[in-house]
Amino acid sequence: MKVLVTALIISFSTAVLTVPVSIITAPLSVETIPGSSLDSTKVLGKLEAAYAQYGADSTSFKNSLQNIINAYMSIAADYEAQAGILEVRADIAEAAKNDVLATELEIKGDALEALAEGYTKTAEMLQEFLKLISEHEHKLSVVFREVKSGMIGTAAMESRLRPQATSSLPATGGQPSTGGKPTTGGQPTTGGQPSTGGQPSTGGQPTTGGQSITGGQPTTGGQPTTGGLPTTGGQPSTGGQPTTGGQPTTGGQPSTGGQPSTGGHQQLGVNQPEETPAPNRQLKMFRHYSKVCWQI
């Protein structure tokens, strides 16, 4: 409380408290002025007494504070009136060519005006403080706590008492914008929960790890051509019987361009293709087949 009230009057007390007491106690009815300076200890004493007496009773405390404000405004008015009287007397002394007296009266008048201004501004600051209490009666305990903790100035007080603006949720990283559920098969919503664990967006079941295309049934041609009867690579049966009655080459290319086999045995049950013979081997085989055909 002391810190608050000191802050309320500190901007005025410097000028007021430096007024020479001799000027205030000089003749010309100055002695009738209630008080000789802005006594900050009186301000503190009044507020502390009110706080100690009423505590958190906001109505009683506000009434006591208002009485202090009224008293200070009354004192300020008295000082202002006395300053006006001194100003008139200074003008009379100046007209009478009494420059020394005129100067003295002007100095006394300025001092009284400073006192009046000090009490007025102190009362205004207390009135602002009372306004804050009236606007935030439900937070009166906060006001007293801030005062005791050393918070000074009504502007700082008001910032503490003013309701804080409701903070909105952050645009990113907060709650998801739509339902918070993952989007099935789609991309995750920005700022929401990722769609990990949902169904993939293409193909339903993943192609990798499911049924393998490679090694399964071929997509064209029915049965695979590999492993069937070869259409090429075997030696044509030159000069023998036609290759009729053998296994058909299902799914393979037709055997075209081979020489008809006349006079030979049917080539039945050929299972695997032979390697293409080397030239020397072809010559030996040709001679062998020629001898066989000659013997027949």
From Swiss-Prot:
Record localization: Secreted
The species this protein was found in: Lottia gigantea (Giant owl limpet)
Signal peptide start and end residues: 1-18
Main location: secreted
Expressing tissues: Component of the acid-insoluble and acid-soluble organic matrix of calcified layers of the shell (at protein level).
Region of interest: Disordered: 157-280
Protein name as it appears in the record: Glycine and tyrosine-rich protein
Gene Ontology CC, one term: extracellular region
Compositional bias segments (type: Low complexity): 172-264
Keyword vocabulary terms for this entry: Secreted, Signal
Coiled coil: none
